[in-house]
A protein has these predicted regions:
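Residue-level signal for the short linker/turn that defines the boundary of a DNA-recognition helix
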Residues: 1, 12, 27-30, 136
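Glycine- and acidic-residue-biased ligand/ion/polar-headgroup-sensing regions
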Residues: 114-132
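Ligand-binding loop in jelly-roll beta-barrel domains
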Residues: 78-81, 139-140, 148-172
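Short alpha-helical DNA-recognition segment
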Residues: 1-19
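Short acidic-glycine-tyrosine-enriched beta hairpin
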Residues: 85, 132-148
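Short amphipathic recognition helices of helix-turn-helix/homeodomain-type DNA-binding modules
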Residues: 45-56
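Conserved short histidine dyad/triad with adjacent acidic residue
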Residues: 62-72, 78-88, 96-114, 148-151
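DNA major-groove recognition helix of helix-turn-helix/homeodomain DNA-binding modules
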Residues: 30-45
Length: 172
């Protein structure tokens, strides 16, 4: 499939698709979800290459960085580190991650939207979630569950670092 066709079907710009292909900082999870939907593959296809039909166990001592994303679609710095908790699980529909949100003093960010649902549980720090016209501040132990088709953005409250558990469901 040509890059222009992929971009159009995924409702992305050609520049966004080229940035993803170039192995530079990824602009966020939403563009990958949109591309996966267009290609008819699961999101995990882009994140890991080993497949297991049975149970997949993630051990704390084995935690490793899966992928880094920028919280700002137009900028190149990365401030979200995703640790996959389902790496290698074949045919999964849920994508559980522990996400380290790094300090970021840039107040500008782009809201994202994609099909599916998200559940977020705050493990450490505080996060601010813009969801539609609402803003929620969550502290350690708080959680939120929402439809991700509504425009949303997750970041550290007042630019501070935080750590969350995020479970993302994306229909294929």
């Amino acid at each position: 499939m040509e890059i222009e066709v992929l971009a159009e079907r995924a409702q992305l710009t050609v520049e966004q698709v080229k940035a993803i292909e170039s192995d530079g900082p990824l602009p966020g999870l939403a563009p990958l979800i949109k591309i996966a939907r267009v290609l008819g593959v699961r999101l995990g296809t882009f994140l890991d290459d080993q497949q297991s039909v049975g149970a997949v166990v993630s051990r704390a001592q084995d935690e490793r960085e899966s992928v880094r994303f920028s919280n700002h679609a137009a900028e190149g710095h990365e401030n979200m580190i995703y640790h996959s908790l389902s790496e290698g699980k074949d045919n999964r529909h849920l994508e559980p991650f522990v996400i380290d949100i790094l300090p970021d003093q840039n107040p500008k960010f782009d809201l994202s939207t994609h099909e599916g649902e998200e559940f977020i549980y705050v493990l450490d720090g505080q996060v601010e979630i813009n969801y539609g016209k609402n803003t929620y501040v969550l502290e350690k132990g708080d959680s939120i569950y929402y439809d991700s088709i509504v425009k949303h953005h997750v970041h550290g409250y007042n630019g501070q670092k935080a750590r969350i558990l995020a479970v993302i469901y994306t229909p294929i």
